[in-house]
Amino acid sequence: MKKTVKDLALRLKAHFPDIIAEPVEFRGECTCTLLDSNRLHEVAEYLRDQLDFDFLKEATSIDEPDKPLRFTLVYELYSYYHRVQLRLKTSIAEVPGKISSLSDLWASANWQEREIYDLMGIQFENHPDLRRILMWDGYPFHPLRKEFPL
């Protein structure tokens, strides 16, 4: 039976009560915040296998240098079965600046994670081909970081 995005978000929260913040709905969209980024892969696998989020539409990152957890990663997931979209967010510190790759769960994560690595410097553990995608090897900066010299 098809579910609403709110129903699915509440199921996610019920399954991971200690690490998923209360889902936030705004204008028909639903955002779930993962409080423990070390468990990203486990949560993403549950979303794919148990809640039918079979497509990663987009992965991106936000640089907030004044926060202790400087980088926020944002994943836009889509369920073709339920016909709903869910946003999953988690934050990491600049050091070590690493998070699990989701490329083994969704093939679409491969190049998106490479782009985040190239432009923000975030490392994706267990990525099959983590190398720069836009800038050349040896380029000393990550152009989307706030301290990028203009």
List the predicted regions and their residue ranges.
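Terminal low-complexity/charged segments
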Residues: 1-150
